């Protein structure tokens, strides 16, 4: 009997070791709020590895998308990443210019976005409209347009640095879509007069807002859903501006010349109903596929499709010029 037990234990240990040896690793670069214990990453990883026991997902977190993209650009073709997850439509051209990403084999007919997505290299995994979030119990008269937000000196505002944050970059695009070139500097100056802080990333700025450091914070129209669903609070709301809203589409991409079947499978898994539910409820963003994912987010998605969307085509040179204008204006 002892010999049988010893044989069984040895077999089990050998099987475990063999499985570990046979596992294929997938290195995923992403932003820290996705990979954190409360983010979507661990849940997506767990369910993916359960469905694909031959695969092991390893996350490398970065404090912002800007920092992530800079790392990828520096590493170039020597990057250890198999997948880069967390770029967005406003970083798209810069990411393409790195030359390190390859087309994926994911079926795009599953996608259901406000505008048709045809890019075969960068795969959407969630989306949402930028908005300013406020506490209804503290701010009874919220701004009804971006211009009103800029001009009202009784409002205190927090937003993110467009050089390092994708959310901050969204405001940069939004401001330049609403204000003509000859008015944009004065608009930034007006906004700066009642800006409390410009933070490096979304997490620290939203945290500062929740501590009561400002009336409004740049975030997403989905953000109040977090407080409703997870904190049972309905005092937070998102602005609905007359000029329309800018939509952010978050993206994942495969690194070229890194043959890895598990990485290909993980890309496809990102837009499965299982992964989408984890992503939308942790990221507090909207699902990118058709069908029922989560009732509250599904309802908001239908509502947002009726909102005015202003999504100008923006190239890298424009963004560089806009950032330079913003930076110069704020340092004068």
Curated annotation (Swiss-Prot):
The keyword Methyltransferase does not apply. Thiamine binds at residues 202, 220-223. The keyword Transport applies. It comes from the Bacteria. InterPro entries: SBP, SBP_1_CS, ThiB, ThiB-like. GO terms for cellular component: outer membrane-bounded periplasmic space. It is found in: Periplasm. It holds the Pfam family SBP_bac_1. GO terms for molecular function: thiamine binding; thiamine pyrophosphate binding. Residues 1-20 form the signal peptide. GO terms for biological process: thiamine transport; transmembrane transport. Keywords: Periplasm, Signal, Transport. NCBIfam families: sfuA, thiB. The complex is composed of two ATP-binding proteins (ThiQ), two transmembrane proteins (ThiP) and a solute-binding protein (ThiB). Part of the ABC transporter complex ThiBPQ involved in thiamine import. PANTHER family: THIAMINE-BINDING PERIPLASMIC PROTEIN, THIAMINE-BINDING PERIPLASMIC PROTEIN-RELATED. Belongs to the bacterial solute-binding protein 1 family. This is Thiamine-binding periplasmic protein. It comes from Haemophilus influenzae (strain ATCC 51907 / DSM 11121 / KW20 / Rd). The lineage of its organism: Bacteria, Pseudomonadati, Pseudomonadota, Gammaproteobacteria, Pasteurellales.
């Amino acid at each position: 009997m002892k010999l049988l037990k010893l044989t069984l234990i040895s077999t089990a240990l050998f099987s475990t070791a063999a499985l570990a040896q046979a596992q294929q690793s997938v290195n995923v670069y992403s932003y820290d709020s996705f990979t954190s214990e409360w983010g979507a990453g661990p849940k997506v990883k767990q369910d993916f590895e359960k469905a694909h026991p031959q695969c092991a997902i390893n996350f490398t977190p970065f404090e912002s998308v800007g920092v992530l993209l800079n790392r990828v650009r520096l590493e170039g073709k020597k990057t250890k990443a198999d997948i880069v997850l967390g770029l967005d439509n406003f970083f798209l051209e810069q990411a393409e210019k790195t030359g390190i990403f390859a087309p994926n084999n994911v079926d795009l007919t599953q996608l259901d976005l406000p505008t048709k997505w045809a890019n075969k290299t960068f795969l959407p995994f969630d989306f949402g409209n930028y908005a300013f979030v406020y506490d209804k119990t503290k701010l009874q008269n919220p701004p009804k347009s971006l211009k009103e937000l800029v001009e009202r000196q009784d409002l205190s505002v927090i937003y993110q640095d467009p050089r390092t944050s994708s959310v901050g970059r969204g405001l940069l695009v939004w401001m330049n879509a609403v204000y003509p070139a000859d008015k944009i500097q004065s608009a930034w100056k007006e906004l700066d007069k009642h800006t409390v802080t410009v933070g490096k990333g979304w997490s620290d700025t939203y945290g500062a807002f929740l501590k009561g450091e400002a009336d409004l914070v740049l975030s997403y129209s989905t953000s109040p859903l977090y407080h409703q669903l997870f904190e049972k609070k309905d005092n937070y709301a998102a602005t609905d501006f007359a000029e329309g809203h800018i939509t952010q589409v978050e993206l994942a991409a495969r690194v070229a010349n890194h043959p890895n079947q598990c990485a290909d499978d993980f890309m496809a898994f990102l837009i499965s109903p299982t992964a989408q539910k984890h992503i939308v409820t942790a990221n507090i963003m909207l699902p990118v596929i058709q069908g029922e994912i989560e009732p509250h987010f599904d309802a908001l998605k239908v509502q947002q499709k009726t909102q005015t969307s202003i999504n100008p085509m923006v190239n890298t040179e424009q963004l560089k010029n806009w950032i330079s204008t913003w930076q110069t204006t704020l340092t004068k």
